[in-house]
């Protein structure tokens, strides 16, 4: 992995107010970096949550605290003009109360008094086609639930030795979540 290019691309995404493209970054850098090189870098191999952990692990170790909080979130990157696929599809957006077309992704932040760092993520893939009985239309659904993704991310945080006191999540947890070597009881208010 080309860490300097990854850092540059991440900075570009964070600092941009509008649409971001490889061509846009190349233009911003006055063609000192070709858009083809950026595109090749982005399509080299799938970037996983484990890759993210390897990058942020040294930072987490510097700031880790027993009273840290894991904040899990569910977001949608809107892609209204892109063709539907396993990754890009229709998702219910709780902020607008409507279905929107885009990429649904789940994130986990490790938050201390000092900083918030991303430590895990999952992409919601609607990898199964089915026929809606009411409309007769072909639709897509995920074979792995968001709850299962959240549990996987939580287990990874425990396995990676991140100390934390609380977990904040946007979905209702199951009664018992097996995490690491023990079970953690969850309660709904």
Predicted regions and their residues:
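Conserved, well-structured functional cores that handle cations and Mg-NTP chemistry
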Residues: 1-188
């Amino acid at each position: 992995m080309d860490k300097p290019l990854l850092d540059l691309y991440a900075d570009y995404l964070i600092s941009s107010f509008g649409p971001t493209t490889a061509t846009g970054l190349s233009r911003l850098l006055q063609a000192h970096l070709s858009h083809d090189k950026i595109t090749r870098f982005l399509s080299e191999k799938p970037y996983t949550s484990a890759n993210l952990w390897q990058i942020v692990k040294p930072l987490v170790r510097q700031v880790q605290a027993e009273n840290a909080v894991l904040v899990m979130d569910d977001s949608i990157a809107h892609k209204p003009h892109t063709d539907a696929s396993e990754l890009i599809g229709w998702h219910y957006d709780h902020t607008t109360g409507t279905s929107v077309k885009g990429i649904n992704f789940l994130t986990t932040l490790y938050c201390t008094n000092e900083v918030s760092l991303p430590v895990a993520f999952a992409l919601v893939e609607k990898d199964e086609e089915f026929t809606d009985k009411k409309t007769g239309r072909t639709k897509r659904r995920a074979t792995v639930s968001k709850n299962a993704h959240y549990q996987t991310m939580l287990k990874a945080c425990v396995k990676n030795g991140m100390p934390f006191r609380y977990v904040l999540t946007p979905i209702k947890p199951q009664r018992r979540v097996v995490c690491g070597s023990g079970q953690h009881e969850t309660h709904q208010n």
